[in-house]
């Protein structure tokens, strides 16, 4: 998935790196000053640059498609220390960045709405609901259906947290009409190790890329099982980490049935 897509979609490298970036040392506060610099898979490479306060300045992802390749650039914009929007472009040298997303906040300082843009017009938005601990409880997706003129909500995700601060279950819900009841489409179960997820110390990483368990949980995901509600076979994935001498993850091995993907990371 491309960083330039709406709905907060991100490249496969960034998504896989979301697991790897969650090493047990803070990516932004290490005594060695370590910051994640690059993430590579066999088909993609993402380079992350930072502002002086160690917030993300830019994500540049290069995708290889056979003999072709293309680039996605995501640029966060901050005001008074708050993330207010992100810009997107395929080529900073030849194409000016355009508005990709904007963020609205509630009275408690939580991001409650993420709007997505196409040609400077809102093409969809997410409405976010938090529990009394400030944890994301639900995410409602709004789009304008074909042939209609107003936004409707046909899909949502519900999150269950454990006492350690990890999302242990995500329920994917759908409905045919905006006024119909939601029905369960699939359930995703997560298991974790006991290592600290340093990704949460990278300011706004989840909102810049995507809101999911790996971006929000306190520990590192080691297994993920997707169970369809229609009784179809479940899909299981596992994640294993290798660390360098400074205790940073330098490799993540993702296994899905007989497939294996290796993600390599470099630090600065």
Regions found by a protein language model. Give the residues of each.
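Buried hydrophobic residues that stabilize the cores of well-folded domains
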Residues: 25-268
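Bacterial Sec-dependent N-terminal signal peptides
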Residues: 1-32
